[in-house]
Amino acid sequence: MNCHRSHQSPRRRTLCFSLNTALIAVLAMGALTSSAETPRVSDGHGAYATGKYRNLFMEQGHAASEVKAKIDAAYQQLFHGDPQTQAVYFESGKNANGPLAYLTDWANHDARTEGMSYGMMISVQLNHKPEFDALWNWAKTYMYISDPHHPSYGYFSWSCKTDGTPNEETAAPDGEEYFVMALYFAHARWGSGKGIYNYKAEADRLLTTMRHRAVMSGSTRFGPRTVGNEVDEKYKMIRFVPGVDRGDFTDPSYHLPAFYELWARWGPVEDRQFWAEAAEVSRGFFVKSTNPVTGLAPNYANFDGTPKPTRSPQSAIFSYDSWRTASNWSVDWSWWGKAPQERVLSDRIQAFFAAQGLDKFGDQYTLEGKEVAGRHSTGLVATNAAASLAATNPRARDFVETLWKTPVPSGEQRYYDGMLYMMSMMHLSGEFRIWAPK
């Protein structure tokens, strides 16, 4: 079954499903360990170990007050700006758990787990608890599949209409990944409450489901589905979807080793070794899945890193999902400093886009570097700038300064562009941090 992530906007992505089972783990040193033990993993040399986060804007001469004002203004515009031209966050009444709000893809008139989880992450990082809780309440109320007989039980419908009606009843793992991480950070920053606001319990439950959900078949509003877990145990990678019929490949932009390292420390104990190994696998996968000259990754890839063609024309090229991949490896370098190849990858992709022209590069390319679509998208401007966290070449400063001068996205495409703009600004200013439990 095929379902498109976008219809009217230029951003499209095919979704459906997958499965597998859990195995025993081996420590990197070669010694066998019980799955109930916390793995002995290095803390690396990044912000997790040092507690220090670079502010690249200040490094380039912008005052701390300027940086804070710029980020605060972006949050205000995207969350509380003009509802027709600026905002993507909308309040939606109350229920027994309190206020409700959704974050919408304005061009497609829906709410997605991707955007809802991004909104929660941005809110916990910037200490906006009311918005965080309202988004989580809406996600649990309308997106969460609580029927134990439903094939997607325990997951979230990846897309709903803004009235809460599902557009599909299957999951997109990038949403679950960001939900889990945002909930752990909320627990660390604000403390857990009761019910759906017991952030740690909710994160633990969802992370367990992602790895261990048994295969289930059944009916949905959109036809029969067979759904399993969201990871491939053999390859130790996140799947594109948890459906059995479409679960044999991955999406490079779903790979979040910076998060997996934290789950290897804070997640359910029996799964910590798996996430420690998954982090290392993803670091190697970034190299395998990117072109050795351009640094471009495909939207979808096989587990060996080769591009994965599907009926979606963007599957095997650098397209909308792919924008995020460089940001993922660069944040991993910033937080952990364990994989020097990530620095090479950042230099490589920035060299490619610099050659295209910082003020005019397109937003879709073949992996070899032939332009497919010429729209100059703020979201890609943002993630290319975030690559500067790992870059070594002086050109990285030009990418940072270009983002600094770029206005907050508005208009029809403000959802995806806006979320990537907001998070990249936070990464580059040192305001996207690890909130560790006390």
What are these regions (language model features)?
Residues M1-C16:
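N-terminal secretory signal peptides that target proteins for export/translocation
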Residues L32-A36:
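Sec/Tat signal peptide C-region and signal peptidase I cleavage site
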Residues E37-Q77, Q84-A87, H109-T113, P148-Y155, ...:
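Extended ligand-binding clefts on enzyme/binding-domain cores
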Residues D82-Q86, F90-S92, P130-G175, F185:
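Lumenal/extracellular "mature" regions of secretory-pathway glycan-modifying transferases
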Residues H109-G119, G164-G191:
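Aromatic-rich carbohydrate-recognition surfaces in CAZymes
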Residues M120-K129, A139:
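Alpha-helical support elements that line or immediately flank enzyme active sites
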Residues G362-K438:
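C-terminal functional modules
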